[in-house]
């Protein structure tokens, strides 16, 4: 082994500079952050050759006291903290005291600064970490710093620099992030003597977004905010029209600091999941204000990453805020169409074991449900009534399928649903008045029988609730024009034209049904003919061990088969015929990286695919009653506006929109 040597100060400074100063944009970032901490309201950045030849920062901040000018360039010299405890209370951009020392050790640096209480300022010039001179000078209040010939004394770093154009682009990007983070500060970027970027410091975030991007983006934004005890989440998300194929238009700011965070990005993108198409990424500018003691900003040399005390709670707060904002925007767009006061909506979330106030046309019939007579999760296999339950059949108890039943109705197949019961005594004990009420209700209008909705929330319950879904005013001012190309449904309502994609709409109805089954725990498993054996890494196996219940509740039957090997015997029937190993590993990956514990989330894509395959297709001819049924089912949904893959289920044209198209109005 070689002898251990103590490195001299110059060498250690150059090594430290390599961590803090990667490229010219790193210099701009550190110096502009110093200007912001100094309270500057106007900051000018001048660069030449992508910052490799010259970087000049001029601000009107508080300035540096003459006595501190020399100390400012010493390693770990800072005015921001006094002890290690202060790091966890930090509210400024910088705090380590490394930037100026690192920059001056690998460049030629000149700094001039003056505070308001002095009539003159100080100027210092440092070359390669050595002070060449320190003198009095005349200058404005604030600080001007010039960094030239970056890495001139570190040839190994110099040859790895990118092109001037690439570095200029990186500097422009970081300046744009500053403009977004600080709308109250005016930034001016000058490249080769020409103005490249200019913001006006109006304090309005929308003005900053328009400055950084363009008018189109600034006019397609959705505001959102959520405030908790220790955290506030707010900002703007873009409408689906301005989504992109990359994440370049995404900005995250934690306490005004621009950071990169995979889990925050995942929270926002998951909120957009059912609103965007595959491989599309949302636009967003998100601000997170949190007490400093709940984050650690000292986990990365450039402070571009932060660590949160409770990432799970943070994920939920961000997801909920963004998701509600998107839903609210879409809901507002289709307020006239989805006016749920116009129709009696069946409450599929209410448990049948709860007392329910029966309205005029409602009947409850107690039925003993034997475990052998379960309704299939897709509503396909239903046993016929034996013996005296034939009474229900004879009076014509029929039900068109709903969210809780198979939607074969849309393919012109109307199923008769008979209530299976092997315990005849239960039915015999029913009040005869109930049957007369049912018969009256069903025979009220033989030409247009009312639709009955059936719900079996729990196969162990002793009763089934039958509720009539009777339209009130919904169809009064709605006119079904028909189908276009047997694919799009045309509807006129309140002087607005709605075009519904029948496949996307039905796909969403089915998806919500499948999703509901999983959330309520009614998952039926299918036994595999050949169990699937999967070898896991130690880390993957530990994640599985921590989340056994998740897999069990999702319909998996898994056994340990060796040290880090598992044996899968059963998988959820609802997912059809998946690639078992890929599905299992996808869930495991989500549990590790997305912090998701909801089975509905970790199986989202598989459910969406199944719904897509089961839904009515383009070119399927639908009758008017089938169209009405589809619309009624859409009304029940919390989010009927997009299919699970993010495509819109419907679009709207107002009378004004059409008259503009035909040049009737301007």
From Swiss-Prot:
Cellular component, GO, one term: mismatch repair complex
Disulphide-bonded residues: none
PROSITE patterns: DNA_MISMATCH_REPAIR_1
Keywords, in A-Z order: DNA damage, DNA repair
InterPro entries hit by this protein: DNA_mismatch_repair_CS, DNA_mismatch_repair_MutL, DNA_mismatch_S5_2-like, HATPase_C_sf, MutL/Mlh/PMS, MutL/Mlh/Pms-like, MutL_C, MutL_C_dimsub
Keyword set includes RNA-binding: no
SMART domains: DNA_mis_repair, MutL_C
Any one GO molecular function term: mismatched DNA binding
SUPFAM superfamilies: ATPase domain of HSP90 chaperone/DNA topoisomerase II/histidine kinase, DNA mismatch repair protein MutL, Ribosomal protein S5 domain 2-like
Segments crossing the lipid bilayer: none
Pfam families in UniProt: DNA_mis_repair, HATPase_c_3, MutL_C
Endpoints of the signal sequence: none
A GO biological process held by the record: mismatch repair
UniProt keyword DNA damage, yes or no: yes
Family in the record: Belongs to the DNA mismatch repair MutL/HexB family.
Function: This protein is involved in the repair of mismatches in DNA. It is required for dam-dependent methyl-directed DNA mismatch repair. May act as a 'molecular matchmaker', a protein that promotes the formation of a stable complex between two or more DNA-binding proteins in an ATP-dependent manner without itself being part of a final effector complex.
Entry-linked HAMAP family: DNA_mis_repair (MF_00149)
Protein name (record): DNA mismatch repair protein MutL
